[in-house]
Swiss-Prot record:
This is Guanine nucleotide-binding protein subunit beta-5. Belongs to the WD repeat G protein beta family. InterPro entries: G-protein_beta_WD-40_rep, Gprotein_B, Guanine_nucleotide-bd_bsu, WD40/YVTN_repeat-like_dom_sf, WD40_repeat_CS, WD40_repeat_dom_sf, WD40_rpt. Enhances GTPase-activating protein (GAP) activity of regulator of G protein signaling (RGS) proteins, such as RGS7 and RGS9, hence involved in the termination of the signaling initiated by the G protein coupled receptors (GPCRs) by accelerating the GTP hydrolysis on the G-alpha subunits, thereby promoting their inactivation. Increases RGS7 GTPase-activating protein (GAP) activity, thereby regulating mood and cognition. Increases RGS9 GTPase-activating protein (GAP) activity, hence contributes to the deactivation of G protein signaling initiated by D(2) dopamine receptors. It is found in: Membrane. The lineage of its organism: Eukaryota, Metazoa, Chordata, Craniata, Vertebrata. Keywords: Membrane, Repeat, Transducer, WD repeat.
Length: 353
C-alpha cells in the first residue's frame, strides 16, 4: 500500500512538471504573436476631452455595507444587497424604496434583476440563491413567494440571470459556477476548474453566444462554454484575487479588477492580455469594473473610496470621482449608458451622471 502511495505521488509530481512545461510552451507561442501594444495601435485616436461626472442621487437606507447592486432593464430601478441582510429595490429617479426583503442571513453578497424586471435573485452566506417575484401590491408578503433555486456548499459570491427569467448562473466560494433552472431548481450544468473561491462572473452579450467569464481567488479569469461546461480560455496574469470581471460591449474582450491594484483587458481573439490600467499612486485593490456603452471608458471602484475612470484604448486615467466615505464595493453602468451606480461600505449607493 505504501509503495502505491509513493507511485501516486511520483505520478502527480511528474504530471505537475509536465503541466508547467506545457504552460511555458503555450506562453512562448502566445508571445510570438504579441507584436504590438494596444496603446501603440491607439496612438492616432484622439484623446478624450474634459470629463465631468457628478453624484446626482444618493440612495440611503441600508444599515450596513452595500455589497452588490444591479440595474433593471427599465433603466430606472436598482436592486441592492447589504451586510445588514436586506435586499432593497430602489427607484433611482426619486430615491424611493419600492420593495425590501430581509434575508435569513446577513452578508447578502449577490443580487441580480431578472431581464423581465418582474423578479430579483439574491444570496450570500446562506449558500443558496433565492428568487423573489416583484408585484405592485405593496402589502403582499414577498418572502412567502420565495423560491430557493441554487444550493452550493459554500457562500454565494455572484449571480446573474441568463437572457431569460428561466435560468440563473451562480458563482460560489466552493470553487464552482453553476447554471440552474429557476422553476424546478434543477442543476443544468456545473463548471469546475477554479482552484479557489470564485468571486465574480459576467455573461457574454447575448449576440456573441453562450459563454461567460469568471474570476476568483486563484488569480485566474476563465471563459466557459455554458452548453458543454468546459473552460475554453484561461488567463493568469493577475498577482492577487480577481474581484470583478466584465465583458467589453462587443463581447470580444473582457476587463478584470483585482486586489493587486490593477485592472486588465483581455482580448479573446488574440487570446492574451492587451492592456493594464494602473498607476504607482494606486496601491489599493480594484473591487468592481464596468465599461461605458461605447466601450471607450472603463469605470473602476477601489478600496481607497475612489472611482477611477480609464481611457480603454490609451490606458490613461481620465478622471477620479470622489464621494464615498468607505471602500467602493460594487459598480454598474445603467442599461442605456447615461449613468452608473456605485455601492459602498459607507452604507450608501450613488448614481453618477
Amino acid at each position: 500500500m505504501a509503495t502505491d502511495g509513493l507511485h501516486e505521488n511520483e505520478t502527480l509530481a511528474s504530471l505537475k512538471i509536465e503541466a508547467e512545461s506545457l504552460k511555458g510552451k503555450l506562453e512562448e507561442e502566445r508571445a510570438k504573436l504579441h507584436d504590438v501594444e494596444l496603446h501603440q495601435v491607439a496612438e492616432r485616436v484622439e484623446a478624450l476631452g474634459q470629463f465631468v461626472m457628478k453624484t446626482r442621487r444618493t440612495l440611503k437606507g441600508h444599515g450596513n455595507k452595500v455589497l452588490c447592486m444591479d440595474w433593471c432593464k427599465d433603466k430606472r430601478r436598482i436592486v441592492s444587497s447589504s451586510q445588514d441582510g436586506k435586499v432593497i429595490v430602489w427607484d433611482s429617479f426619486t430615491t424611493n424604496k419600492e420593495h425590501a426583503v430581509t434575508m435569513p442571513c446577513t452578508w447578502v453578497m449577490a443580487c441580480a434583476y431578472a431581464p423581465s424586471g418582474c423578479a430579483i435573485a439574491c444570496g450570500g452566506l446562506d449558500n443558496k440563491c433565492s428568487v423573489y417575484p416583484l408585484t405592485f401590491d405593496k402589502n403582499e408578503n414577498m418572502a412567502a413567494k420565495k423560491k430557493s433555486v441554487a444550493m452550493h456548499t459554500n457562500y454565494l459570491s455572484a449571480c446573474s440571470f441568463t437572457n431569460s427569467d428561466m435560468q440563473i448562473l451562480t458563482a460560489s466560494g466552493d470553487g464552482t459556477c453553476a447554471l440552474w433552472d429557476v422553476e424546478s431548481g434543477q442543476l443544468l450544468q456545473s463548471f469546475h476548474g477554479h482552484g479557489a473561491d470564485v468571486l465574480c462572473l459576467d455573461l457574454a452579450p447575448s449576440e456573441t453566444g453562450n459563454t461567460f467569464v469568471s474570476g476568483g481567488c486563484d488569480k485566474k479569469a476563465m471563459v466557459w462554454d455554458m452548453r458543454s461546461g468546459q473552460c475554453v480560455q484561461a488567463f493568469e496574469t493577475h498577482e492577487s484575487d480577481i474581484n470583478s470581471v466584465r465583458y467589453y460591449p462587443s463581447g470580444d474582450a473582457f476587463a478584470s479588477g483585482s486586489d493587486d491594484a490593477t485592472c486588465r483587458l483581455y482580448d479573446l481573439r488574440a487570446d492574451r492580455e492587451v492592456a493594464i490600467y494602473s498607476k504607482e499612486s494606486i496601491i489599493f485593490g480594484a473591487s468592481s469594473v464596468d465599461f461605458s456603452l461605447s466601450g471607450r471608458l472603463l469605470f473602476a471602484g477601489y478600496n481607497d473610496y475612489t472611482i477611477n475612470v480609464w481611457d480603454v484604448l490609451k490606458g490613461a486615467r481620465v478622471s477620479i470621482l470622489f464621494g464615498h466615505e468607505n471602500r467602493v464595493s460594487t459598480l454598474r453602468v445603467s442599461p442605456d449608458g447615461t449613468a452608473f451606480c456605485s455601492g459602498s461600505w459607507d452604507h450608501t449607493l450613488r448614481v453618477w451622471a
